Amino acid sequence: MKAILKSLVIILVSTPIIHADEYTGREKSETCLGCHAIEGYNNTYPTYKVPKLGGQHSDYIISALKAYQKGERKHGTMHANASGLSDQDMIDIANYFESIE
């Protein structure tokens, strides 16, 4: 029994954990929520529908943020918002949005 417990402790201690703190994700998402949490919100100049991000898969959100950051997706506001985000910021934000509806 001691050997099993010892093995589990070694595995847990040596396994890297990528963790997204819900509070941190919400805090980092405050700017995003202004547009992406409003049902049926339309942006102006040009007019287009802003997607609601609650419940969206985190991998998709991270991919989109990286594309805006690199200029592969075109939108001035999104490029400006994404350009200052670290990889950990993107993980925290994406995991927060995935966790809400």
Per-region residue spans from a language model:
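Sec-dependent signal peptide recognition
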Residues: 2-10
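Sec/Tat signal peptide C-region and signal peptidase I cleavage site
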Residues: 16-22
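Gly/Gly-Pro-rich "capping" loops immediately C-terminal to redox-active cysteine motifs
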Residues: 37-67, 79-81
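C-terminal capping alpha-helices of c-type cytochrome domains
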Residues: 59, 70-73, 81-101
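Short sequence/structural segments immediately N-terminal
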Residues: 22-30, 40-44, 71-75, 100-101
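The canonical Cys-X-X-Cys-His
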Residues: 30-38, 93
